[in-house]
Amino acid sequence: MTNATIMPLTPVIGGEIEGIDLATPISDAEASFIRQALLDHHVVFLRNQALDHEQHKAVGNLFGELVKVPFVESVPCHPEIFEIIKLPEERDVYNFGGNWHTDMTYMQEPALVSILYGAEVPTSGGDTMFASLEDSYDALSSGMQQLLEGLTGVHTADRSYGKAGKFASDTIADEGMDVRPSEDAAKQIEHPVVRTHPETGRKALYVNPNFTFHFKDMSEDEKNKLFKQN
């Protein structure tokens, strides 16, 4: 049993959980509550938490084995955590993670979840935005759904983290972020454009403009035209 509650934040995505202190050992009931809330609401928020790195990782362990994000230097002694930093003087510099994307789709086995801990945030602005690609799929016509279900997306990190990618330029790279461009970013990974969630059975679009390079057997230009239609 748990006394935790969740309040939906919008009709389709987002829920705020109250009644769980992530800095204390999390009970099986609380862990189940968090996992179910994530399935139901896609993204969940727990406010006023005070976590150190070990406690942060303990939350991640509720969902499975932790992984290191490639191409970005991690926190010392904690390879599963990296800091997203925007310095005051970087106001006009490219915003790390500031375009629409799904984390790590360039991996053969992408991470199940990402866990952001707001250690120091602005009093206003600086919003992180989320979208439900399950509801995006549901909103498509049946004809478009059938078309997309037959496609395979080719994903790569090259445009962001490659040797000639965004972060290879001194004019783009954030001084506060320690990004490591690499030839390994050029690797291309295939995922179905429409994926079915193994627990809920809901279908979702699995594409994003940041890492989906093109659709298999289509040009990038043809892919972009399909993106614009949706």
Task: Describe each PLM feature range.
Residues 2-230:
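Non-heme Fe(II) oxygenase catalytic core, chiefly the N-lobe of the double-stranded beta-helix
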